[in-house]
Amino acid sequence: NALGNLAENVLTARFAPSYYPCACRSACCGGKKTNPEWINAIAWLSNHMRSTALFGTSADYRIRRTCVLRHFQAKENRKSLDQMADACGINRQTAGSYMSKVAKFIKVIESSAYSAISDKLQDLNVVGKN
């Protein structure tokens, strides 16, 4: 694992599909099944936020997971901060503060991971140097 667990999980959460199509036609899955790699990445990141971006806060696992999920969701599918706060039983300002901390942390990791991948591809002459 050249990038490390943190970067790997961030990239998995960003780019892996959260669901796969399911052709079983059973009512239990509604035509799609969850991607275990994506689910595991979200869980890993949610746990990691406890000792990093949300260290020293009272954010429990549900709040951390909601923040991580919200960060990676497409804007059109994203719940508002008010909805997030209501679902987690916290006030809107606290939800906004937690989201801001999580987003800033993940953006730094994503940027570092992209740079590392770009450098590796350049070293292998897969892409040209900028």
Model regions: which residues?
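Long, charge-rich, low-complexity alpha-helical segments
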Residues: 95-100, 126-130
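Short alpha-helical "recognition helix" segments of helix-turn-helix
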Residues: 80-90, 95
